[in-house]
Amino acid sequence: MKQRYHLLDMLRGICIILVVWYHVLYNLSEIFGGEYAFFRSVGMNNFRDGFVGVLMVLAGISCSLTRSNLRRGVRTLAGGLLITVVTAVAMPGQLITFGILHFFGCCMLLYAAAHRLLEKVPVALGAAVSFLLYFVTRNLYYAVTGVPHSFLLFALGFRTGHSSADYYPIIPWVFLFLAGGFLGRLFARGTVPDVFKQDPVPALSWLGRHTMIIYLLHQPVVYGVMVLWFSLIK
């Protein structure tokens, strides 16, 4: 029987709550025209990148703990493409062409293809270099100009004229994912502290085990509730 690291589930549950909270604020500010100056502040952007970055690392760890990354990658990428279709039809002004699910799906497929090669790299070296590369490349989108108009380059992280309401390009985020993949080998070996096996808040752990379905459903539900609310108060 595989060991379940409940603390990872709990951290993932906290992050998905923050994702939902962020999208509530996004809807209020960007769709319903609310005036929330703090939403566009540097502090808010850094906070968002912080909890999303934790999700990236956790996703990489999960890839080290399963052999079904090809199947998971295809399923996750399909979820991203579904979001593209739904936003194109229902909310073309908020079209998502390469969001977080597209990113996760691509990374899982890349990990499935390259995991044997990655396993030859020592954990500490791989994690350290991955974190370093994330910080070195995190402003790539703004630093490089004159890139050809290519969706592939846009997905990689270059400014090409394409746009996406939710945008998590391969570079720099893949390096946090890879850092998690390296750290995940410690979990796979069972060499992490026992605290990771504890389940102090089962409700949060449950949320963390169902992040995909929550992510797919939360925005339609949140948006629908807001439309109903604002129609009633008017």
Protein language model regions, located:
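Alpha-helical transmembrane segments and their immediate juxtamembrane cytosolic regions
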Residues: 1-234
